Regions:
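Short beta-strand/loop segments at the ligand-binding rim of alpha/beta enzyme cores
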Residues: 177-184
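Short catalytic helix/loop segments, enriched in acidic residues and glycine
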Residues: 28-50
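Charged helix-capping and loop-helix junction motifs
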Residues: 135, 163-168, 194-201
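Conserved post-catalytic alpha-helical subdomain immediately downstream of the catalytic base
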Residues: 267, 283-353
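Positively charged, low-complexity intrinsically disordered leader regions
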Residues: 1-31
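Conserved phosphate/ATP/ADP-binding segment of small-molecule kinases
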Residues: 176, 190-281
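Conserved N-terminal subdomain of the carbohydrate kinase-like
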Residues: 58, 62-153, 346-359
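Alpha-helix C-terminal capping segments
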Residues: 40, 47-59, 80, 310-313
Length: 359
C-alpha cells in the first residue's frame, strides 16, 4: 500500500467523526451512586488524530460542534496535543441545546465479573446534525493535502446526514490520493445490523484499510466467523483469517485488514494481541497475556493509531501490527479514551521492553 511521503501534505492524518464529553465515576464506581463525575474527552475517530499528534504527527479533526463552553473543552483538548481544528464547523448555540448540543456519554469502568458500561446521551448533537457540504473536504485533501483519512462506523451510524457526509469525504479523499482507513466499530445502541450493512457496503469500495473485530464484520458487512462463542470472548484466528480472505475477495480495493484479539478474563485482565492482513499476507503481533487494564475504552482506537503511525512512517507490515498492539495495550493502562502515551514509551514496549521501573 503506497502512502504519500512525509512533507508532501499539510496533514499526515485527519479524522472525521464526533467528539464527546465522557463523564465517569472515579475508580470503579456506579453512575447512579457517584456524587462526583470525572470529565474526559473522546470519540472513536477523534481519538486517532489525538494519539498521532502525541506521537509527533501533523493531524487535524473534521467535525461539527456547537459554540459553547462545553465544546471549548474539546477544542482546548485537541489544541493541547497540536491537533488542528480549523476544519471544525461551529454551530450557533441557541442557549438551550434544542437544535444542537455536545454529545455526552456516561461510562462505568468495570472490574472483576462486572463489565464496563457506556450510556449515551448524544441525541441531536451538533455532529449528528451535520449535512453534506458543511465541511470543505476538497480544500482539506486536495488543496492543503492529507496523507491519511480515518473515520468509521460510529460516526456513520449517528444519522443519514453523517453517513452521507462520510461518503462525500471518502470520495474527495480518493480523488486526492489520500489513504482511507475505516473502523467498522459496530454499536448496537446506534443502529441495527441491517442499516449498518446498507450504509457500509456503499462505503467499502472507497476504503483502503478496514479495521474491525469478529462482531464488526458479522454485523456491519455480513461476513460470518466460525468458532466464536455467543459472548464473543474468544476467537480462533484461523477462522478469522478465512473470513478476511472472503472480505478482500469481495472488495479487492481493500489493501489492509486489521483487528485486535481480546480474550476477556475479567473486567481488568485481558489477553491482548492483534492481527493484520496486508496485500495477501497475514501478520500477528506479540501477545500480551494477562494484560492488566486500568480502562479498556479506546483500546481499539489505540490499535488503529499505532498501525496507522507505522504505515505513515514507512514501517513493515509486521512492525505496523506490533505498533498497533503495543499502543493499544499501553492506552488501556490509563484512564480516559484518548492516548496519554508518547513515542518513547511506545517504542520501548514495541521493542519488547518490560515494565521495570525507570530511574
Amino acid at each position: 500500500m503506497k502512502v504519500r511521503e512525509a512533507g508532501s501534505s499539510k496533514f499526515d492524518l485527519m479524522s472525521l467523526g464526533e467528539c464527546m464529553i465522557r463523564l465517569s465515576p472515579p475508580g470503579h464506581g456506579r453512575i447512579e451512586f457517584s456524587p462526583t463525575l470525572e470529565v474526559w474527552v473522546g470519540g472513536g475517530e477523534y481519538n486517532v488524530a489525538y494519539a498521532l499528534a502525541r506521537l509527533g504527527m501533523r493531524t487535524g479533526f473534521l467535525s461539527r460542534l456547537v459554540d459553547n463552553p462545553v465544546a471549548h473543552i474539546i477544542l482546548n483538548h485537541a489544541r493541547s496535543a497540536g491537533v488542528d481544528v480549523g476544519h471544525v464547523v461551529m454551530a450557533k448555540y441557541d442557549g438551550v441545546g434544542r437544535a444542537d448540543r455536545i454529545g455526552l456519554n456516561f461510562t462505568e469502568v468495570g472490574t472483576g465479573v462486572r463489565a464496563s458500561v457506556t450510556m449515551y446521551d448524544r441525541g441531536h448533537s451538533a455532529a449528528s446534525n451535520i449535512k453534506p457540504g458543511m465541511i470543505d473536504f476538497r480544500k482539506a485533501f486536495s488543496e492543503q493535502g492529507c496523507r491519511w483519512l480515518h473515520t468509521g462506523g460510529i460516526f456513520s451510524a449517528l444519522s443519514d446526514g453523517c453517513a452521507a457526509t462520510v461518503k462525500d469525504a471518502l470520495t474527495a479523499a480518493k480523488e486526492a490520493g489520500t489513504i482511507v482507513s475505516y473502523d467498522l466499530n459496530f454499536r448496537s445502541k446506534l443502529w441495527n445490523s441491517q442499516k449498518a450493512q446498507q450504509v457500509t457496503k456503499e462505503l467499502v469500495p472507497h476504503i483502503d484499510c478496514l479495521i474491525g473485530n469478529e462482531e464488526d464484520f458479522q454485523k456491519v458487512l455480513g461476513f460470518e466467523v466460525e468458532g466464536v462463542d455467543e459472548h464473543l470472548s474468544a476467537l480462533d484466528t484461523r477462522a478469522y483469517k478465512k473470513m478476511v480472505e472472503k472480505v478482500v475477495k469481495a472488495y479487492p480495493n481493500v489493501k489492509v485488514v486489521g483487528t485486535t484479539l481480546r480474550e476477556v478474563k475479567s473486567g481488568l485482565v485481558n489477553n491482548w494481541s492483534a492481527i493484520l492482513w496486508h496485500e495477501g499476507t497475514f501478520y500477528e503481533s506479540r501477545r500480551y497475556d494477562g494484560l492488566e487494564i486500568e480502562d479498556r475504552v479506546g483500546g481499539g482506537d489505540g490499535f488503529s493509531s499505532g498501525f496507522a503511525y507505522g504505515f505513515l512512517t514507512g514501517k513493515s507490515p509486521q512492525e505496523c501490527v506490533d505498533l498497533g498492539a503495543a499502543h493499544g495495550a499501553l492506552l488501556q493502562t490509563t484512564r480516559g479514551d484518548t492516548s496519554q502515551i508518547d513515542l518513547e514509551e511506545l517504542t520501548h514496549v514495541f521493542k519488547g521492553g518490560s515494565a521495570r521501573i525507570k530511574r
